[in-house]
């Protein structure tokens, strides 16, 4: 060999470009999958080869209009689903019998009628009753396959539920009341008076007179005159005078002013809220922020004294308020007896910091 010649290379196949296989589409994959599962899904013989008696017998039952194939993600025909491309349930029987909704109630009644009869046979045999064949000889005529009796259905249902007192007559309302009363007696040892709860009153305290509370609960105090309840009126007047003497500066003449201010305003409007019968503080609950604001606002605003020519009218018995003192500023009538002082005077007297309250009128 010539040394200038290149050495012969061993035999090699020429390199071919890599073959890119085309991926099948979803339709092709579904068709291939449907072709493999077709004999498993559809096994009914054609209609022409069936027995005519069987065709008449099965004409009531719903039959599939055409082949239904459940593939990876869709059906081959329209169905009642959430989406057209999804199958939310794998219940093939429900999908195949979707025409039963269109047939109406006869298909449902004929389909559900033989089920109680089949369920009755084991229960009758277990109870040891008559185990005759429906068409056999018996003392009475052969019973046709009809719906069972209502009492029989109730008895079987009672046996299946294993509830001995499921169907006898029961007074459920009385049982509920007995259960509530038993729970109250077990927890608290007594049953509360429901009349007090319905009227929104608390039971009387041991230190108070039950007769006075009863009279106060039956009739509002603004209807009663001082002659009907003289002791209560005097006691409440004394307590109101004490509170007012504590709250108002000593410069003003307290007894005369507040005898005048306690009078109800004359007019067609109802009596003020302060004169209405108010239960104890426990009945109203703890004081709220609005009560605190009223106490801050109204304590430092004494009304100007009235002229001496006005005589004191008749006084009305009023229950003492647990939070607020008795003053004419608490009179929530449409026309207050005296105008309130200015906001600047109130801020200067009651608070070290400037409160920006809007001009407000209690009603």
UniProtKB/Swiss-Prot annotation:
Spans annotated as Disordered: 1-53, 104-149, 245-280, 308-332
Domain of life: Eukaryota
Protein name: Proline-rich protein 19
Annotated Pro residues bias: 1-11, 265-274, 314-323
Gene Ontology biological process terms in this record: meiotic cell cycle
Record field: compositional bias (Low complexity): 112-126
Organism the protein comes from: Bos taurus
GO (cellular component) term, any one: nucleus
Keyword Transferase assigned: no
Subunit architecture: Interacts with CNTD1.
Keywords noted in UniProt: Chromosome, Meiosis, Nucleus
Entries under InterPro entries matching the protein: Pro-rich_19
Record function comment: Promotes meiotic crossing over formation through its interaction with CNTD1 by participating in the crossover differentiation step of crossover-specific recombination intermediates.
UniProt key word Hydrolase: no
